[in-house]
Design a protein with these regions (language model features):
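Conserved, mostly hydrophobic/aromatic
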Residues: 11, 43, 72, 102, ...
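Short helix-capping segments at alpha-helix termini
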Residues: 45-51, 75-76, 106-108, 133-136, ...
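Catalytic alpha/beta core domains of metabolic enzymes, predominantly
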Residues: 104-105, 118-228
Length: 276
C-alpha cells in the first residue's frame, strides 16, 4: 500500500478536491471484486475525511453494481461513481432502470458516468434528467466527447435538480469548454500526474480568473494528448513510475508503454511542470 498511500498524500497536499479509487485510471477493469473493495477501504482510511472519496462501483451487471455500491457505502465512501453498463449496450430505458435499481437499494450519493467510447452506449440528456430526480443521484461525469452535452443536460433538468445536480468533465482536453457551459470541474486523468496544476486550473476558472485558467489549459493540453497516446492508463502509469511515484507495470491485457512513446509522454509532463 506504500505507493497508494503516498499518491493520496501527494494529492491532498497538491489541492486535489476529491479522490476516486477504482476509476478507469486505477485499472478497475482488471481488479477482482475483493481487490476493488480493498483499494476503496484503504483509500477511505488514508484520506480520513480530509477530502471526499468517490468510489468507483460500476458494473455491466446491475446486481453486481448494487453489491459493490452497498459495500462501498458500508465502508464509508462519500459517494459512488457508476459507469454505464458496458458491452451489453442497454437501451435508454434499460439505463434508467439500471440506475433506478441501484438508487433504490442504496442511500450513498451516486454520480453517473457516461463514457461511450469505452462502453458502447451513450446516456442521453433526457435519461440523465430523469435520473436526476432521485434524491441520491447527485451528478454526472460526462466523457461523451461533445462538450455541448453539458448544455443539453442542464436544459433537460427539472425541479430541484436544476440547482442541485452537478456536471463534471470526464475529458481533460474539453474541461475548460465544459466549465464555460456550466460544469463544476473534472474527474481527471491528468491530475494523476500533475495534481497541483489541475487543481489550480479548475480553481482559477471557478473563482472567476478565466485568463489564468486559459493559460493553464493551454499549458496542459500536450499532457492531455500524451496520456492517451496509448490506451489509458498505460501512459499515466509509466510516467508515474518514471517520476518515482510508484513501481512500473500494468496488468494484461494492457502492456507497458511502447518505447517509441516514452519521449513524448516524458517531455509533455516535464514541460508542463511534473510534480510542481
Amino acid at each position: 500500500w506504500v505507493a497508494l498511500d503516498s499518491l493520496i498524500e501527494w494529492h491532498i497536499e497538491s489541492g486535489t478536491h476529491g479522490i476516486v479509487p477504482m476509476g478507469t485510471t486505477g485499472e478497475s477493469a482488471t481488479l477482482d471484486t475483493d481487490e476493488h473493495l480493498q483499494v476503496i477501504k484503504r483509500t477511505i482510511e488514508v484520506v480520513a475525511k480530509r477530502i471526499p472519496v468517490i468510489a468507483g462501483t460500476g458494473s455491466n451487471s446491475t446486481a453486481e453494481a448494487i453489491h459493490q455500491t452497498q459495500e462501498a457505502q458500508g465502508l464509508g465512501a462519500d459517494a459512488c461513481l457508476l459507469v454505464t453498463p458496458y458491452y451489453n449496450r442497454p437501451t435508454q430505458e434499460g439505463l434508467y432502470q439500471h440506475y433506478k435499481a441501484i438508487s433504490d437499494a442504496t442511500t450513498v450519493p451516486i454520480v453517473l458516468y457516461n463514457v461511450p467510447p469505452r462502453t458502447g452506449c451513450d446516456m442521453q440528456a433526457e435519461t440523465v434528467a430523469r435520473l436526476a430526480n432521485f434524491s441520491n443521484i447527485v451528478g454526472i461525469k460526462d466523457a461523451c466527447g461533445d462538450a455541448t452535452r453539458v448544455s443539453a443536460i442542464k436544459s433537460a433538468l427539472t425541479g430541484a435538480a436544476q440547482d442541485d445536480f452537478f456536471l463534471l468533465s470526464g475529458e481533460d482536453a474539453q474541461t475548460l469548454e465544459m466549465m464555460t457551459l456550466g460544469a463544476a470541474g473534472t474527474i481527471s486523468v491528468t491530475a494523476n500526474v500533475l495534481p497541483e496544476l489541475m487543481s489550480e486550473f479548475c480553481a482559477s476558472y471557478l473563482k472567476g480568473d478565466h485568463a489564468r485558467a486559459k493559460i493553464l489549459d493551454t499549458r496542459l493540453q500536450p499532457v492531455h494528448d500524451a496520456l492517451f497516446v496509448e490506451s489509458s492508463p498505460t501512459p499515466t502509469k509509466w510516467i508515474l513510475s518514471e517520476l518515482g511515484r510508484m513501481q512500473g507495470g500494468i496488468r494484461l491485457p494492457l502492456i507497458p508503454l511502447s518505447d517509441q512513446h516514452h519521449e513524448q509522454v516524458r517531455n509533455a509532463v516535464t514541460t508542463a511542470g511534473a510534480g510542481k
